[in-house]
Curated annotation (Swiss-Prot):
InterPro entries reported for this sequence: 3-IsopropMal_deHydase_lsu (IPR004430), Acnase/IPM_dHydase_lsu_aba_1/3 (IPR015931), Acoase/IPM_deHydtase_lsu_aba (IPR001030), Aconitase_4Fe-4S_BS (IPR018136), Aconitase_4Fe-4S_dom (IPR036008), IPM_dehydratase_rel_enz (IPR050067), IPMI_cat (IPR033941)
Cofactor stoichiometry and binding remark: Binds 1 [4Fe-4S] cluster per subunit.
Recorded GO MF terms: 3-isopropylmalate dehydratase activity; 4 iron, 4 sulfur cluster binding; metal ion binding
UniProt similarity note: Belongs to the aconitase/IPM isomerase family. LeuC type 1 subfamily.
Protein name per UniProt: 3-isopropylmalate dehydratase large subunit
Keyword tags: 4Fe-4S, Amino-acid biosynthesis, Branched-chain amino acid biosynthesis, Iron, Iron-sulfur, Leucine biosynthesis, Lyase, Metal-binding
Gene: leuC
CDD domains: IPMI
HAMAP family documented for this protein: LeuC_type1
Length: 475
């Protein structure tokens, strides 16, 4: 499609490169480079193809993974829960019938779809990527336009390799400066959501920029883009750079040799032009961000670890005051109490937000030489089989096992209550996942979102605490 010569954002460039046709109302037929599929949102889509006599248009651009319902315990045993077993069996039947590449449950490469895609080189800069999952935005860390779609759209992409979409607005969130000790990408993202709220990015694609973002490794950038959804955005992006190219090089599905160098030449053009227009701009100072944790039932209910739980009486808006009170009642907290010192029952380190090798290393650095507090259940769930094997090669599994953690198989696990890993009513969990809604990790479970390092600190102390205090002890 023809494009203007005016300065363009990264989002605009990727969008324009993939528009097949622009309709009168502004809706575009958008070509999709990669379609990622999992067991929960695909059964009806494949059945729709079957009923209409259609095939998958680009099986070579489609990849399937089982992750949401899979058990993370003993894989040698059959899946006990009937609905979970049926969904995985249905996925296996569908990918075989329609010729879609699949990472099966017992494959060394199986894992969470948003971990597998980047680590395999399936997701690459400049691509359009969709999946029937809201956290598809994770892949934007590579400089791709990646977003979640519904089941009917899954069928449409399977059949046509296109999707009908209207372009989003542009938003740039810049984080400038150097973060302090103990501050991670998760803390940066929670600070952003604390600033703009869970509706702050509605209707926008967020480009994360600034010196603090450039300093992040790829795992950190994936954490940021993963939770752009919790900021209300359609997707999140980080412009590709040398860090990106070094990460992609040598991945199984990435270009090789001269093709890789040619790809890098194109990828270097994927940056917002000077003077490009952003509908919304937000800037944060990195040095003002400290380790953080959520207190309520929304990701925007976030506090620095030295903060106090808000009081409804301090909120002039009656509706907002009622929301605070409901969250306090659900979470079993008192207005005005310090969030540090809140006891935890469970610690979960995993999910598509924070289950990569770098996340496990950060947690192990806190855990090493310590032990899980009495009465606390702590579990590590690697994001993929490859992450698990790499961690074991470094001896991280031994660090966690010696400390009293459970060392599990790859999967979505306790991020959501769709598999055997879930909270029981009233249990309080320090979790590295992305959502702390009521019942998200199990009926009446209480979730505090935090970084892997903060979760590890909670595991060994039995309470929410400032990880910087533990790091001081080892210096």
């Amino acid at each position: 499609m023809p494009v203007t010569n005016s300065p363009r954002t990264l989002f605009d460039k990727i969008w324009d490169d993939h528009v097949v046709e622009r309709l009168e109302d502004g809706t575009c037929i958008l070509y999709i480079d990669r379609h990622l599929v999992h067991e929960v949102t695909s059964p009806q889509a494949f059945e729709g193809l079957r009923m209409s006599g259609r095939r998958v248009r680009r099986p070579d651009a489609t990849v399937a993974v089982a992750d949401h319902n899979v058990p993370t315990s003993d894989r040698s045993k059959p899946i006990e829960e009937p609905q979970s077993r049926l969904q995985i069996e249905t996925l296996e039947k569908n990918v075989a019938e329609f010729g879609v590449p699949y990472f099966p449950l017992r494959s060394a490469s199986q894992g969470i779809v948003h971990v597998v895609g980047p680590e395999q080189g399936i997701s690459l800069p400049g691509m359009t990527i969709v999946c029937g999952d809201s956290h598809t935005s994770t892949h934007g860390a590579l400089g791709s336009l990646a977003f979640g779609i519904g089941t009917s759209e899954v069928e449409h992409v399977l059949a046509t390799q296109t999707i009908l979409q209207k372009p989003a607005k542009n938003m740039r969130v810049s984080v400038e400066g150097k973060v302090g000790p103990g501050v991670t990408a998760k803390d940066i993202l929670l600070a952003i959501i604390g600033r703009i709220g869970t509706a702050g990015g509605t209707g926008h694609v967020i480009e994360f920029a600034g010196s603090a973002i450039r300093d992040l490794d790829m795992a950190g950038r994936m954490t940021l883009c993963n939770m752009s959804i919790e900021a209300g955005a359609r997707a999140g992006l980080v412009a590709p750079d040398e860090t990106t190219f070094a990460y992609v090089k040598g991945r199984p599905f990435a270009p090789k040799g001269e093709a890789f160098e040619q790809a890098c030449d194109y990828w270097r053009s994927l940056a917002s032009d000077d003077g490009a227009y952003f509908d919304t701009e937000v800037t944060l100072a990195a040095e003002e961000i400290i380790p953080s944790v959520t207190w309520g039932t929304s990701p925007q209910n976030v506090l620095p670890i030295d903060g106090s739980v808000p009081s409804p009486s301090d909120e002039p808006d009656p509706a907002r005051a009622a929301q605070i009170q409901r969250a306090l009642d659900y979470m079993g907290l008192e207005a005005g109490q310090k969030i540090a010192g809140t006891p935890v029952d469970v610690v979960f380190i995993g999910s598509c937000t924070n289950s990569r090798l770098e996340d496990l290393r950060a947690a192990a650095d806190v855990v090493r030489g310590r032990h899980v507090a009495e009465g606390v259940r702590a579990m590590i769930v690697p994001g993929s089989g490859l992450v698990k094997h790499a961690a074991e090669a470094e001896g991280l599994d031994k660090v966690f096992l010696d400390a009293g953690f459970e060392w599990r198989e790859a999967g979505c696990s306790m991020c959501l209550g769709m598999n055997p890993d879930r909270l029981t009513p009233g249990q309080r969990c320090a979790s590295t996942s992305n959502r702390n809604f009521e019942g998200r990790q199990g009926p009446d479970g209480r979730t505090h979102l935090c970084s892997p390092a903060m979760a590890a600190a909670a595991a060994v102390t039995g309470r929410l605490c400032d990880v910087r205090e533990l790091v001081k002890e080892t210096v």
